[in-house]
Amino acid sequence: MFPFFFALFFSSTDVLAASPSYNGLGLTPQMGWDNWNSFGCSVKEELLLGTAEKIVKLGLKDLGYNYIILDDCWSSGRSSNGSLLADDSKFPHGMKYVAEQLHNSQLKFGMYSSAGEYTCAGYAGSLGYEDMDAATFASWDVDYLKYDNCYNKGEFGTPEISYKRYKAMSDALNKTGRPIFYSLCNWGQDLTFYWGSAISNSWRMSGDVYPQFDRPDSRCPCSGDEYDCSYPGFHCSIMNILNKAAPMGQNAAPGGWNDLDMLEVGVGNMSDSEEVAHFSMWAIVKSPLIIGADIDDLKDSSLSVYSNPAVIAINQDVLGTPATRIWKYHVSDKDQYGEGEIQLWSGPLDNGDHVVALLNGGNNERSMNASWNDIFIDYLADSDELSNTWGLYDLWARRMSNATAASILSGNMTSAGLNYNVTQLNYTAGIARNDSRLFGDRVVELSKGESLTATVPGHGVALFRLRPE
C-alpha cells in the first residue's frame, strides 16, 4: 500500500545482490490469499476463517494457495509494555487461535505490519519495535509477514538506507527461531531488486496494482520500462507493472522473487481474456500468486482462471527462472486509452522444457508469431543443447469449464478429484510423470527453423509449454 504523505525525492546507488534463499524459505513463489484489495480495513476473524474454509472447499488449497494473509487494520495499538495488541472486537479469540484454525486446515497464517511509525492505514507500525514485534508474531504462530513502507520517517533515499531499515525486521524474525516468510512491500523503492534477496523472500517492485489492463492513471506516474521509479504511486495497471518488471527477472531466483502485487482476477471488471493474460504473465515471470478477490463473490470464469494447474506449474517450476521479454512492438489498433502493444516472452524450465507467451495488448484479435531464433535467443543457433523438434502444448486448452466452476461455487459439485492436488503429487513430480493436467493439449510440432504461430484475442495471451522430442 502507498502512504498518504510521501517525500518526493531520493537518489540511488547500486548495491550488490546477495545469494538467494537467505532463510531457506520461498524456493518457489508463494501462493495464497490477501484480504486488502477486496476488503481493505473491513477485517475480522470470521472473514479470515470463512475464506480459508472456502479456499479448501473450492480446491484452491490443493493447487497450492496455502497462505491466508491478514493485511492492515487488525491492531488496537500497543500494551503498556509496548507489545502489539490484536483488536479483540475483530478477533475475539486472539491471533494464536486464528493460526491454530488455519494450521488445522493445512494452511499457513500471514500477517502485516509496516517499516514505519504507522501502517498505511494509520495503525501502530513496527519501526523501532522490530525485535518485540517479531517475537509477538512468532508467539502467535505466524508463518508469513508482509512488511509495508508507510510513514517511514524519511528513512529512504539510497539502497543502503532502505536495506538497513528492512534488515532490522529480517534479523528480528530470524532471531525468533520460527520459519517466517518475509515479504517486503516497499514498492521497489531504492532498487529493492538488487538487495531484496539478501534479507527477504520476495519484494514488491512497483506501485500498487488495480484491476485495469492498461488504463493510464496519474497516480501511477511512471510508465513503460521505468523500473527505477522515484515515485511508485498506486493505481498501476497490469501492463504498466508487467513492463516495469521486464528487466528484473535476472534478479529473481529460488528464495527471492519479484512481487508484481496481488492478482486482480475476480476484482473489478476486466474481461476474461484480460484475466487470463494477467494470471499467465504473473505466473511466467515467477511473481507470487496471491489472490486479491472476495472468494465468496468469485465469478465462475475467475475460479476457472485460478484453477489452471498447467499455468501454476510454470510458476512453481523449481528452476525458478523468470521468462524474459524478447521483443515489444506498438500496434495501430489501440484501445480506448490509446494503448496497444504486442510482446513475446520466453524462458527455460527445470526439465529442459520451455515456456513461450505471445501477449496481445492490441484492441483486436490478431495472428502472432515467434521465430525459432527469438524463442531460443539465449542459445546458439546450432547449439547441441537444443532439440531439433519440440511438442507445443497449449496451457489453456484444458481449462476448467465455466459450468464446472459454477457448480463448484454453488456447492452442487465437489472439487475433489477435479483439481490437481499438490499435497499428493507436487508439480515437479507431476511433470516428471507426464500428468496431462499440467500440459494442456499438444497442438503442433515445432521443428528447427520454424515459427510458432497463434491467434491471440485482443488484450489476451497465447501460452505454451514446449517439450523436446
Swiss-Prot record:
Reaction it catalyzes: Hydrolysis of terminal, non-reducing alpha-D-galactose residues in alpha-D-galactosides, including galactose oligosaccharides, galactomannans and galactolipids
Chief place of localization: secreted
Highest rank taxon of the organism: Eukaryota
S-S pairs: C41-C73, C120-C150, C220-C236, C222-C229
Keyword Metal-binding listed: no
E.C. code: 3.2.1.22
Record-linked InterPro entries: Aldolase_TIM, Glyco_hydro_27, Glyco_hydro_27/36_CS, Glyco_hydro_b, Glyco_hydro_melibiase, Glycoside_hydrolase_SF, Melibiase_C
Residue positions the entry lists as glycosylated: N81, N174, N269, N369, N402, N412, N421, N426, N434
Catalytic residues, chain numbering: D148, D208
Places the protein is found: Secreted
Keywords: Disulfide bond, Glycoprotein, Glycosidase, Hydrolase, Secreted, Signal
GO molecular function annotation: alpha-galactosidase activity
GO terms for biological process, alphabetical: melibiose catabolic process
Entry binding sites for substrate: D71, D72, K146, R204, Q250
Signal peptide region: 1-17
GO cellular component terms given for this protein: extracellular region
Pfam family of the protein (one): Melibiase_C
Complex and partners: Homotetramer.
Similarity section: Belongs to the glycosyl hydrolase 27 family.
Protein known as: Alpha-galactosidase
Organism name: Lachancea cidri (Yeast)
Gene from which the chain derives: MEL
